[in-house]
Amino acid sequence: HVEGALLTETLLQASGARVIKEEVALSVSSAGYQIAGERYDQVILATGAWLGQILESIGYQVDVRPQKGQLRDYQLDLDTDEYPVVMPEGELDIIPFQKGKISMGATHENEMGFDLMVDQALLNQMETEALAYYPELAQATVVGERVGTRAYTSDFSPFWGALPNQAGIYVASGLGSSGLTTGPLIGWHLAQLVAGGNLRLDSADYPVEQYVKKRVGQKS
């Protein structure tokens, strides 16, 4: 079972890429694209539920909404290395890791915007449901909660590829709960687009123009 944060950190270290954690805006000029005072010929925007905010400044409207997700982490005094992942019908998933760690979640809250507050009552309700599948949770120690924001489109489909009418900008969003599994594949394809390489998937199956459009009255 994959620890997403650890995987991301490992890949970043292996790539040697410089990571700058900063809130930025995108602007277009005759010399290219400006981000945080730097000029670029090509840009990949993989900003999840925030894609609409980035593209709004250059005249686009984006069919992407935020969905709040919460989960709870537990520690058990058991060997969970061979425990299976349990995915019953509904929102509940129970994901065991090594050395007794188990994660339970996650909520799918469509009306909470970008709120990141933990709702203990909601997680307690989910825990009660989880006990039917993992009675051991009753003896587990709660070690923390995590809250994040997923990106969804109106039809729950992801999209990726070139931004319409704006050469050199590539976008991806709408991955929802599949980001950890499908994100690396889509990221590879975006890198291939920038580098002029060959694709394994047909980008026409994930049409950007269906979800990202120029606002009425905006010039192409």
List the predicted regions and their residue ranges.
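Short beta-strand to alpha-helix junction loop
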Residues: 1-13, 117-122, 181
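A structural motif corresponding to the C-terminal end of an alpha-helix
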Residues: 14-18
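A conserved short coil-to-beta-strand element within the FAD-binding core of flavoproteins
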Residues: 19-34
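Hydrophobic residues embedded in beta-strands of well-ordered beta-sheets
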Residues: 32-34, 101-102, 169-170
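Glycine-rich phosphate-binding loop signature in dinucleotide/nucleotide-binding domains
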Residues: 36-39
